[in-house]
A protein has these predicted regions:
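Active-site gating/interface segments in enzymes
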Residues: 1-132
Length: 132
């Protein structure tokens, strides 16, 4: 939850992930503009790569607004690997399975780069290496 209580506050929620096999996830991103948070801006964005017929993705964005002069936005990009990208990899002798790993790792590594705290970024990097 991004809670805006004062004037001219900013928030940005970025959720990114990869779902494979029979995995599932629920994302409830909430931006809450409280009374007194005039001139505030809140945004939430989600990017999910679906890699399996049995994955379940649930996205529930919510913007609460008790103030008039605010800007709130939300968006989601959810989908499978594009055929053109798969063709690109296959034309270079890279299997579909390896292509999926490369793309999934790249998406998750981007989260590490966007993380300001070095210890957190390193911890995330270690988990990505273990999982993929």
């Amino acid at each position: 939850v991004a809670l805006h209580e004062g004037k001219r506050t900013n928030s940005e929620i970025n959720a990114s992930g990869v779902l494979k096999d029979a995995s599932s996830k629920l994302f409830r991103g909430t931006i809450d503009f409280q009374h007194g948070s005039a001139e505030s801006v809140g945004a939430e964005k989600e990017d999910v790569l679906l890699m399996g017929d049995d994955v379940v993705n649930q996205t529930i964005p919510l913007i609460l607004c008790a103030e008039e002069d605010v800007k709130g936005s939300h968006g989601a990009s959810i989908g499978e690997l594009e055929q053109g990208m798969l063709f690109y990899f296959e034309a270079r002798g890279i299997s579909r399975e390896e292509a999926e790993k490369i793309v999934a790792k790249a998406r998750l590594e981007r989260l590490c780069q966007d993380t300001e705290d070095a210890k957190t970024a390193e911890y995330m990097h270690q988990i990505i290496e273990e999982v993929i």
